[in-house]
């Protein structure tokens, strides 16, 4: 029953963790164990510049996720260009459309960018959020029915 809740909590945690990833150095630091380090296009530096964060799993050591659009890519090859792969698979990513460094944005520009990042999160995880809300509503309804049944010593038929 709580699988949607767990996925929702994990997704929100990722959204919060990634708010610091506007900083190139923070993104780069996630690539400490990246399998491609030299003589290739997908070096840690190039991956971080393209907005990626290294999110390895036990079975997939080369998973990279854009901190902005949350697009996850795996199966990297040495000749894969991070910018090209990112734009092919997430052309509407707000990070890709930046024309200047985040530090050079006005406060208004940065807030608009952050609002776009949060919208991307909700687009990606809206079904998880909806499932979580539905599960919580069902559980709350059940608790209320049990409470009122016990208070008034009657049974309530939900199928009517």
From Swiss-Prot:
PTM characteristics: Ubiquitination is required for centrosome-targeting.
GO CC terms, sorted: chromosome; chromosome passenger complex; cytoplasm; kinetochore; midbody; nucleus; spindle
Main location: cytoplasm
Chain positions recorded as Zn(2+) binding sites: 66, 69, 86, 93
SMART domains with a match to the protein in the record: BIR
Residues recorded as bearing Phosphothreonine in the entry: 43
GO BP term (any one): spindle assembly
Molecular function per GO: metal ion binding; small GTPase binding
Similarity comment text for this entry: Belongs to the IAP family.
Designated name of the protein: Baculoviral IAP repeat-containing protein 5.1
Disulfide links within the chain: none
Pfam families in UniProt: BIR (PF00653)
Comment text on domains: C-terminus is required for spindle assembly.
């Amino acid at each position: 029953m709580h699988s949607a809740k767990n996925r929702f909590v994990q997704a929100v945690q990722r959204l919060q963790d990634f708010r610091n990833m506007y900083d190139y150095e923070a993104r780069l630091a996630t690539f400490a164990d990246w399998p491609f380090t030299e003589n290739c296009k997908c070096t840690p530096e190039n991956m971080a510049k393209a907005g990626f964060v290294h999110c390895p799993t036990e079975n997939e050591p080369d998973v990279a996720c854009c901190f902005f659009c949350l697009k996850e890519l795996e199966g990297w090859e040495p000749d894969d260009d991070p910018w090209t792969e990112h734009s092919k698979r997430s052309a509407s990513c707000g990070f890709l459309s930046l024309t200047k460094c985040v530090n050079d944005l006005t406060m208004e520009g940065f807030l608009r960018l952050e609002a776009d990042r949060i919208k991307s999160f909700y687009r990606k995880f809206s079904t998880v959020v909806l499932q979580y809300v539905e599960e919580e509503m069902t559980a709350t309804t059940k608790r209320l029915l049990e409470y009122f049944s016990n208070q008034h010593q009657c049974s309530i038929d939900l199928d009517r």
